[in-house]
Amino acid sequence: MDDKASVGKISVSSDSVSTLNSEDFVLVSRQGDETPSTNNGSDDEKTGLKIVGNGSEQQLQKELADVLMDPPMDDQPGEKELVKRSQLDGEGDGPLSNQLSASSTINPVPLVGLQKPEMSLPVKPGQGDSEASSPFTPVADEDSVVFSKLTYLGCASVNAPRSEVEALRMMSILRSQCQISLDVTLSVPNVSEGIVRLLDPQTNTEIANYPIYKILFCVRGHDGTPESDCFAFTESHYNAELFRIHVFRCEIQEAVSRILYSFATAFRRSAKQTPLSATAAPQTPDSDIFTFSVSLEIKEDDGKGYFSAVPKDKDRQCFKLRQGIDKKIVIYVQQTTNKELAIERCFGLLLSPGKDVRNSDMHLLDLESMGKSSDGKSYVITGSWNPKSPHFQVVNEETPKDKVLFMTTAVDLVITEVQEPVRFLLETKVRVCSPNERLFWPFSKRSTTENFFLKLKQIKQKERKNNTDTLYEVVCLESESERERRKTTASPSVRLPQSGSQSSVIPSPPEDDEEEDNDEPLLSGSGDVSKECAEKILETWGELLSKWHLNLNVRPKQLSSLVRNGVPEALRGEVWQLLAGCHNNDHLVEKYRILITKESPQDSAITRDINRTFPAHDYFKDTGGDGQDSLYKICKAYSVYDEEIGYCQGQSFLAAVLLLHMPEEQAFSVLVKIMFDYGLRELFKQNFEDLHCKFYQLERLMQEYIPDLYNHFLDISLEAHMYASQWFLTLFTAKFPLYMVFHIIDLLLCEGISVIFNVALGLLKTSKDDLLLTDFEGALKFFRVQLPKRYRSEENAKKLMELACNMKISQKKLKKYEKEYHTMREQQAQQEDPIERFERENRRLQEANMRLEQENDDLAHELVTSKIALRKDLDNAEEKADALNKELLMTKQKLIDAEEEKRRLEEESAQLKEMCRRELDKAESEIKKNSSIIGDYKQICSQLSERLEKQQTANKVEIEKIRQKVDDCERCREFFNKEGRVKGISSTKEVLDEDTDEEKETLKNQLREMELELAQTKLQLVEAECKIQDLEHHLGLALNEVQAAKKTWFNRTLSSIKTATGVQGKETC
């Protein structure tokens, strides 16, 4: 619908929510035509009404008429189907009455499969008033109810489409600010696939329409306020992230409740589809969407060599894990819609603590197995998880009681027809408990399941490499949780006033999941049982249990009346044990632990029945799962415990019911009590003689309470054992929904096995009209198929149990019928030919003998087989022991050789240490000696240098004195020039030269001696360096030997010696 079609707009917050929080509705995407302006205030001044055309009625009608120009929606194809008309069930209070036209019309039915919104609204048969009693008389049009004389006050954009406060505020604003209103007629459909229409009251033409699945919320004004005669509904605007509220006013206030009741009826009802709808459905965009159901199960080591599924707390929806226990992750992937895709393999199972984790934070687990399940419906991946790994430390520490942790699991799959791998990501809550805590809870579900929607795009032929290449590429993968997180609203609800000005939200119940009539019986174990219970009832039961625990041997007085109304599901496990008298059953618990270790002769029958017990229940449907394993143990233990009866067909159903409410040990104890104390095992004894007595009693009760049905059964030759055998042997647990089964067990444990007659008569009485119309085959089919399906509705089951409880069947009457039966049997026995009786008894004994012989042969064969297997195991063990002995001797010899080698190496190492220490001391002494010699020579050289310098200085001083004296002497001055040299006297010169040559020769001799001493010193230094190099060479050889022996400590010692020696050598140089 165009934005122009809205009568008025109120500026609200721009934080509009884009999607709806329900599976029932389509995705709302953004259309950027108009964006609501931001409203930072909350008063009426800031949220004023803006009416198109300044309040002109003609302009208003024109704008509303534009709605008819909207393009057709993609999710509603043009196919039209006949819709079965359903009458409106309403209350006849006030001046309103219902009238449906006789003409049947054709409505367009959307092909999108929607789950109906939840709502609980009481529906009572209406009492028709006269048509002229009110101008608001509904008129049926297009399978709908039409209400006239309504005033349309306008519409506005809202940010919180399910907020009652926001809706009432908008209703008040629109009512107070609307000056010119528009009279309309409102057409409300009777089914959830219909469309709400606004009609012109004059011309009966359509002004606007709103599909029911787009209407999110209905509300009416509070009593005592000006808006008490108004109602409104919010709808998701087509192709925009806008939610709009439409407000109406009724001339008669009482009409508001009738209109909201019509909306409630539309929410609840679903039109019956004709067979043509399946064949005429065109291809939708969903044909490229493949839905997968992915389940996660966590198993822990139970200490017995097996892995058992951990329990799941339904209140917190979290797994309960034990700290430090090895675990396994099991993933079940099952495709639920579209063409089947072949899963080729799994190449990765990953785990990480936390929520919304990155791919880099995921840690790979070791894969143990992958492949199709035994039934071929799902692909199973199993991986081992070591919680002690540092990566998983967060989920291996005990969690406080008031907190939970998140854990993310991912599985990567290769699908044959898909071009790239697909990853399914599961986020779950977990709580870590102490490893010593016993996790016994009768939870029916120990796995978590998530639905994924994989959208694929087919690759064109020219884009493929070859014909065998993949056919699809992934467009997007989205989980159901992600869809819900993007949605902003819950399922539609209707608000109705209560006393005063208060109003309450009444959610609509899910649509009855009615299946088409077929010959398939209802699967056992069907029907979800809610743990919700009124607080007052829980308080009453709490007080009763407190009193009961004070004296467990005496039942409280009000117990029977409370049990008749049903025991709260959360308390059934405890109450059943108290009713059965299992408060002191330690001996049975210990007995059970011993019995499960023994072999049962009826093992094959038990295994066969286990696979057929409660296939519709999640806890028992998996072959080899925890549920079937526990059920097998209980049945096997009882077959060994009760040797006279053993296991009889049907006991598994009763055991399964008990196992859903208590651990194995307690379930076994209650089963024993029911079989022995309540007399159920008597039905299986003496060729079912007591069971036939029960059939006779039932037929006599039918003759008294339902004589016409009794006579009809006689006419069609239908006997009680043909339809009631399963009722008595399984206590109604085999075919009926679980909430009805649990209630029957409540009554049986409280009042005894005679309750079966009450329930059986109740079933026959409520089905009398149908059974009277059947023949022999039809009656059997009715008991097998139609009768259990009739009680899929919990309301029908409650009515049946009320009828059964109100039936008064005295024990005196049952005793009387029992005596009649035994008298009749005695008469038959007396009238019977003794020869025939003996022949029959003989045949029975022969059959028993043959059966025992067969069992003997089977046991003998099993014994021989066991002996052969044990002999084989013993031979294998002996061979393995011989091999281990040989290996042990070889290992001992290797150990002796290794010890000798160790001693030899230790001796060599000690010798090498001593040699190195000796050479090191010698080298240190020589280095010290050389150092002292070098120091002495350095001192001598320095002294000679100082002495030479002193002599030169003294000579210069003496020459200077002589020159001064010569200059002062007039006679001698003539012999010397200005530079101090002799002018011409050769003799003097010779004398002086001679003296100078002698002095030089003396100095040269002294210098030559010093050079000789220095050369000798250098020679000694070179010899010392040669010795040091020789020592270093010896050290290198020793180091190589140590390295060859791989003695690291000696290597470090030699390295330190070498380093010290090298440093000292350099200092010496």
Curated annotation (Swiss-Prot):
User: At which residues is Phosphothreonine found?
Assistant: T996
Where in or outside the cell it occurs: the entry states:
Cytoplasm, Cytosol; Cytoplasm, Cytoskeleton, Microtubule organizing center, Centrosome
Which purpose does this protein serve, as stated in its record? May act as a GTPase-activating protein of RAB6A. May play a role in microtubule nucleation by centrosome. May participate in a RAB6A-mediated pathway involved in the metaphase-anaphase transition.
- Domain named Rab-GAP TBC: which ranges? 566-752
Q: Where is the stretch described as Disordered?
A: 1-79, 482-527
Can you supply one Gene Ontology CC term for this chain's record? centrosome
Upper taxonomic classification of the species? Eukaryota, Metazoa, Chordata, Craniata, Vertebrata
Where does this chain mainly localize? cytoplasm
In Swiss-Prot or TrEMBL terms, this protein is called Rab GTPase-activating protein 1
Q: Which GO terms describe its molecular function?
A: GTPase activator activity; small GTPase binding
Positions marked as site (Glutamine finger): Q649
Organism for this UniProt entry:
Pongo abelii
Pfam families from the UniProt entry: DUF3694, PID, RabGAP-TBC
Q: Taking every annotated instance into account, which residue ranges of this chain make up the domain PID? A: 142-298
Site annotation (Arginine finger): which residues? Answer: R608
Q: Where is the composition biased (Polar residues)?
A: 489-506
Q: Where is the composition biased (Acidic residues)?
A: 510-520
Q: Which residues carry this modification: Phosphoserine?
A: S42, S360
Q: How does it assemble?
A: Interacts with RAB6A and tubulin gamma.
Please name the InterPro entries in this protein's record. Answer: Kinesin-like (IPR022164), PH-like_dom_sf (IPR011993), PTB/PI_dom (IPR006020), Rab-GAP-TBC_dom (IPR000195), Rab-GAP_TBC_sf (IPR035969), Rab_GAP_TBC_domain (IPR050302)
